[in-house]
Amino acid sequence: MDETVAEFIKRTILKIPMNELTTILKAWDFLSENQLQTVNFRQRKESVVQHLIHLCEEKRASISDAALLDIIYMQFHQHQKVWEVFQMSKGPGEDVDLFDMKQFKNSFKKILQRALKNVTVSFRETEENAVWIRIAWGTQYTKPNQYKPTYVVYYSQTPYAFTSSSMLRRNTPLLGQALTIASKHHQIVKMDLRSRYLDSLKAIVFKQYNQTFETHNSTTPLQERSLGLDINMDSRIIHENIVEKERVQRITQETFGDYPQPQLEFAQYKLETKFKSGLNGSILAEREEPLRCLIKFSSPHLLEALKSLAPAGIADAPLSPLLTCIPNKRMNYFKIRDK
């Protein structure tokens, strides 16, 4: 086994938490069950890694085997990357073709290898009619960098592909070309939608978030819940509070639905506007360049946070459509300009 392959496998195994190690190694299916039984997983991790590397050397693991292990690790730790969404489209009058996974993989790989002398492309199919693709980029003069790959998840017979954000922006056009041609589409555009949660992005673009996420029952009338109201409070005020809370709940449910929201961590709004003033000689009014403003909302679970604002009394209901339209618009990066 090549030293670079051994080092690659070693680094990948070291990233894997011990409580996930046997699960990931079994999913890798490179080492046999008998070989794994010879490993004492209760000893120090460094010793476990050395034993596993020795077993891989005995089986002469290749760079393809090591890349497959890395894909499996990333499938378990998708949230370590920020994922972007690309949408493809057919040309006018083009029919939907039958999808052939083998043909797709061969075509995708050939396009990249023709353009770049040094590139490693690996695939792993999943049960959801999806294929995970790992691309280690090189150049005409340098070998592929296995430690800064791009990951792509493509769902067959759909126009959507999800890619991990990469600092190698120069390769984005080539990646788009390979996806478009291999999937038999005509063109590709990057959507203004990003998140660390791949399943949530998938739910948004496929409009599955009101089906795939568990629903919860909140049909209990507000009168039957504890509103935290003082029992000595005027009955008219109590009634007014109940009516207002019911109104807020109704609007919130109409806006967000009665189910958990897809998980996004941020929404960004870029505003460009000309300053308008009725005063003559205003310095800002004479300014040719538009005023630019950037607003970013962030939260571990942004949509659920927005959903809770009005019921918590932090914001008035309904919220601004710019905040509530994120799932339907399928975007969390907005550019707002003067009409």
UniProtKB/Swiss-Prot annotation:
GO terms for cellular component: cytosol; inner kinetochore; nucleoplasm; nucleus. Component of the CENPA-NAC (nucleosome-associated) complex, a complex that plays a central role in assembly of kinetochore proteins, mitotic progression and chromosome segregation. The CENPA-NAC complex recruits the CENPA-CAD (nucleosome distal) complex and may be involved in incorporation of newly synthesized CENPA into centromeres. CENPN is the first protein to bind specifically to CENPA nucleosomes and the direct binding of CENPA nucleosomes by CENPN is required for centromere assembly. Required for chromosome congression and efficiently align the chromosomes on a metaphase plate. It holds the Pfam family CENP-N. This is Centromere protein N. The modification Phosphoserine is found at residues 226, 235, 282. GO terms for biological process: CENP-A containing chromatin assembly; chromosome segregation. Keywords: Centromere, Chromosome, Kinetochore, Nucleus, Phosphoprotein. It comes from the Eukaryota. Component of the CENPA-NAC complex, at least composed of CENPA, CENPC, CENPH, CENPM, CENPN, CENPT and CENPU. The CENPA-NAC complex interacts with the CENPA-CAD complex, composed of CENPI, CENPK, CENPL, CENPO, CENPP, CENPQ, CENPR and CENPS. Interacts directly with CENPA. Identified in a centromere complex containing histones H2A, H2B and H4, and at least CENPA, CENPB, CENPC, CENPT, CENPN, HJURP, SUPT16H, SSRP1 and RSF1. InterPro entries: CENP-NAC/CAD_complex, Chl4/mis15/CENP-N.
